[in-house]
């Protein structure tokens, strides 16, 4: 019997054990992938080419509104559930609530830190949140101080790294992701952390709450993995591999069974939770730049992706083909989102503009 304790193991021996464990893990992953490939008697792309007609390339959205008001790079935007309002965050130090119908500013909220990276609208429309390099998630109540500046209602401090993404569960709870490789669930009323989700090995860049089951959410990180989390259990229940570089964006499909990701490897990918595997890849040899943001149409047939080359590219989800590009920004498309009714797409850019697109 080996009586050697872990404390007696030399650093070299420990490193050798770690490398051996990694090799075994990679071998097991390859075996699992081969087994899944054996069971897959067809592909989504093959089925779609047999049963779905191609989407006409001349039926692309056009710019209907341009929202001007920010004075620096826009890093994030998020639609309200009322389909009319949206919030945007810029490094000019402002959080702006917009009326997308009229292009008017409803609120212009000065931020304590201009290094903002994310923002979110509560489903009720009562609150917005933001955060960034200050490591803090700041909550603002839109129903207070209507005649004066909107002030911080709550500051949620607990992350050891920058805040990369935040999404409200309801008016009482919010999820955040961070460069400290964790996600957290917070109680907004008390300002306390309820659950910490730790399993990634790189900065967590994006999260998306399941639209049909608020007990689960997904995350994408710089370890190139996407994970499905059970909020009640406080742990990851599925891990999805396929990307070859950082995952910058992740978004659930409206049905809650699938999700899309966007990565620095210049591809978007479709994963299915029930099949526990990747179903499609969206990319081409001519696309070399990374993806900053992703969203799907309400039907799930179209995938919108923001790229570093100033374009929002549109993909046919089932056939895996590029339908076209939405061109109009003069710098990186940093964020985008589809309104709840599916009629409008909003894109935000480093050119300081937001554009509303529709048919």
From Swiss-Prot:
InterPro entries: G-protein_beta_WD-40_rep, Gprotein_B, Guanine_nucleotide-bd_bsu, WD40/YVTN_repeat-like_dom_sf, WD40_repeat_dom_sf, WD40_rpt. Residues 1-36 are annotated as: Disordered. SUPFAM superfamilies: WD40 repeat-like (SSF50978). Belongs to the WD repeat G protein beta family. It comes from the Eukaryota. Guanine nucleotide-binding proteins (G proteins) are involved as a modulator or transducer in various transmembrane signaling systems. The beta and gamma chains are required for the GTPase activity, for replacement of GDP by GTP, and for G protein-effector interaction. WD repeats lie at residues 69-99, 111-141, 158-187, 199-230, 242-272, 286-316, 328-358. GO terms for biological process: signal transduction. This is Guanine nucleotide-binding protein subunit beta. Residues 21-36 have a biased composition (Basic and acidic residues). Keywords: Repeat, Transducer, WD repeat. It comes from Cryphonectria parasitica (Chestnut blight fungus). PROSITE patterns: WD_REPEATS_1, WD_REPEATS_2, WD_REPEATS_REGION. G proteins are composed of 3 units, alpha, beta and gamma.
